[in-house]
Amino acid sequence: MTYYNVGKIVNTQGLQGELRVLSVTDFTDERFKKKSVLALFDDKDNYIMDVEVASHRKHKNFDIVKFKGLYHINDVEKYKGCSLKIAEENLTDLDDGEFYYHEIIGLDVYEGNTLIGQVKEILQPGANDVWVVKRKGKKDLLLPYIPPVVLDVDVAAGRIEVELMEGLDDED
């Protein structure tokens, strides 16, 4: 079975079994909604068990998640440092123009016929996502995911077509 990273448990939160999760997923509200099933993996990427979300809230830069049946700090403390993942079969279908992070990361980025680099990470700083593009011999390029910049995404072809606006590439 294929799993995709959703977040990393970085600490406990209070005494009632809540966990502080550093999210690395798209569609956070969907991933952590009540009754969502996630898989827990240890720091060596070994499957531990499936967990069902009992509650979720945001606190500062973290997602605070509580799992069904784990209602005390003693039940969850051992999971600090573990990863949360979603099984591929639990992913929902997306609308046209929407993509999962795992579909975008690794795609080649082109401006015309010129290869710029490859998407290595996706950041969520605010209003829109920012794609981090790894380039050979240059600093990473921060590419905002907005229509004037990202012209086409072809997951099947492994290609993203962009038009770099003036000022985006500080190495020109």
Curated annotation (Swiss-Prot):
InterPro entries given in the database record: PRC-brl_dom (IPR027275), PRC_barrel-like_sf (IPR011033), RimM (IPR011961), RimM_N (IPR002676), RimM_N_sf (IPR036976), Transl_B-barrel_sf (IPR009000)
Physiological role: An accessory protein needed during the final step in the assembly of 30S ribosomal subunit, possibly for assembly of the head region. Essential for efficient processing of 16S rRNA. May be needed both before and after RbfA during the maturation of 16S rRNA. It has affinity for free ribosomal 30S subunits but not for 70S ribosomes.
Occurrences of domain PRC barrel (ranges): 96-168
GO cellular component: cytoplasm; ribosome
UniProt xrefs under NCBIfam families: 16S_RimM (TIGR02273)
One GO process term, biological-process aspect: rRNA processing
Keywords for the protein's UniProt record, in alphabetical order: Chaperone, Cytoplasm, Ribosome biogenesis, rRNA processing
Compartments it resides in: Cytoplasm
Subunit text: Binds ribosomal protein uS19.
A Pfam match: PRC
GO molecular function, one term: ribosome binding
Name of the featured protein: Ribosome maturation factor RimM
Superkingdom classification of source: Bacteria
Family as reported in the entry's similarity comment: Belongs to the RimM family.
PANTHER family: RIBOSOME MATURATION FACTOR RIMM
UniProt domain comment: The PRC barrel domain binds ribosomal protein uS19.
